[in-house]
Amino acid sequence: MQAIKCVVVGDGAVGKTCLLISYTTNAFPGEYIPTVFDNYSANVMVDSKPVNLGLWDTAGQEDYDRLRPLSYPQTDVFLICFSLVSPASYENVRAKWFPEVRHHCPSTPIILVGTKLDLRDDKDTIEKLKEKKLAPITYPQGLALAKDIDSVKYLECSALTQRGLKTVFDEAIRAVLCPQPTRQQKRPCSLL
């Protein structure tokens, strides 16, 4: 059985841990708990192929900037996450996460993931953003960013409702099993 290492990165509180817990346990966790990182392992079938999917959670907080890259070697695919209701986390994909991942892993495939899809149409959330002269991130904005960072795919999901959740991980596996030729041939990350 092929083993695939998938590392999840993004700003603190965008829902990385909830994404992983909801996917692996089919249950949405309670309160927000910042993570250093937890590893999950799941045997899954994608396109009739059995895969051992190793899921690596990371801490988005700046305190962990020096520690986080220790989980990057031998990564097969990255999920760079941002919250659809946090424009700052969206901007940080370009400003921080993409450069960090590419610095350590120049040719590992990336999937861009917009989280908290259930809140994009939530009246209270929209109102809070409007008070700060902000708005939720739209699907076309997500697609444009994915193109800018040469992401294999752009996907949106909700860990709460599980809408689009399984697709995120299926596509992460497909990005490794059926690599798309890009400007550079993709290969697992290694630190020299």
From Swiss-Prot:
InterPro entries given in the database record: P-loop_NTPase (IPR027417), Small_GTP-bd (IPR005225), Small_GTPase (IPR001806), Small_GTPase_Rho (IPR003578)
Catalytic activity of the protein: GTP + H2O = GDP + phosphate + H(+)
Modified residues (N6-acetyllysine): K147
Gene3D superfamilies given in the database record: P-loop containing nucleotide triphosphate hydrolases (3.40.50.300)
Main location: cytoplasm
Covalent lipidation (S-geranylgeranyl cysteine), chain numbering: C189
GO terms for MF: GTP binding; GTPase activity; protein kinase regulator activity
EC number(s) on file: 3.6.5.2
Localization terms from the record: Cytoplasm; Membrane
Membrane topology: Lipid-anchor
Maturation-removed propeptide residues: 190-192
Residues that bind GTP: 10-17, 57-61, 115-118
PROSITE patterns the record matches: RHO
Keyword set, alphabetical order: Acetylation, Cytoplasm, GTP-binding, Hydrolase, Lipoprotein, Membrane, Methylation, Nucleotide-binding, Prenylation
One Gene Ontology cellular component annotation held by this UniProt entry: lamellipodium
One Gene Ontology biological process: lymphocyte aggregation
Mechanisms controlling activity: Regulated by guanine nucleotide exchange factors (GEFs) which promote the exchange of bound GDP for free GTP, GTPase activating proteins (GAPs) which increase the GTP hydrolysis activity, and GDP dissociation inhibitors which inhibit the dissociation of the nucleotide from the GTPase.
Record PTM Cysteine methyl ester, positions in chain: C189
Pfam families per record: Ras (PF00071)
Position of sequence motif Effector region: 32-40
Family statement: Belongs to the small GTPase superfamily. Rho family.
PANTHER family in the record: RHO FAMILY GTPASE
Protein's job: Plasma membrane-associated small GTPase which cycles between an active GTP-bound and inactive GDP-bound state. In its active state, binds to a variety of effector proteins to regulate cellular responses, such as secretory processes, phagocytose of apoptotic cells and epithelial cell polarization. Regulatory subunit of the phagocyte NADPH oxidase complex that mediates the transfer of electrons from cytosolic NADPH to O2 to produce the superoxide anion (O2(-)).
Complex and partners: Interacts with DOCK2, which may activate it. Interacts with S100A8 and calprotectin (S100A8/9). Found in a complex with SH3RF1, MAP3K7/TAK1, MAP2K7/MKK7, MAPK8IP1/JIP1, MAPK8/JNK1 and MAPK9/JNK2. Interacts with PAK1. Component of the phagocyte NADPH oxidase complex composed of an obligatory core heterodimer formed by the membrane proteins CYBA and CYBB and the cytosolic regulatory subunits NCF1/p47-phox, NCF2/p67-phox, NCF4/p40-phox and the small GTPase RAC1 or RAC2.
Name of the protein described by the UniProt record: Ras-related C3 botulinum toxin substrate 2
Species this protein is from: Mus musculus (Mouse)
